[in-house]
Amino acid sequence: MLVLTTETIPGKGIKEVKGLVKGSTVRCKNIGKDIASSFKNLVGGEMNSYTEMLTEARQIAIGRMVDEAESLGANAIIGMRLVSSSLAAGAAEMVAYGTAVIYEDA
């Protein structure tokens, strides 16, 4: 599955638009890692446990979006975007969305 942030596919034509596809996940850290991150916040520096959590959340959200596009018979997603939001202390939602299309050589 081709996943692009652009609205077009260079050298290809859009044969059919299948529609909006999306994938989401809500992730949280366990209390031990959350406490460790709180200490890191006091002294500065990267909060590795949160970086890992968001990386995993992006991968899951994109994977779910791709699954939805494949179920529609699409071979690409264009205009892909990621949105994250904080839901509660230590929890974050990640949403991936885009337009599922079928492309062909131009």
Swiss-Prot record:
Database matches in Pfam families: YbjQ_1
InterPro entries (UniProt xref): UPF0145_dom_sf, UPF0145_YbjQ-like
Domain of life from the UniProt record: Bacteria
Similarity section: Belongs to the UPF0145 family.
HAMAP family found in the cross-reference section: UPF0145 (MF_00338)
Protein name: UPF0145 protein CPF_0876
Source organism phylogeny: Bacteria, Bacillati, Bacillota, Clostridia, Eubacteriales
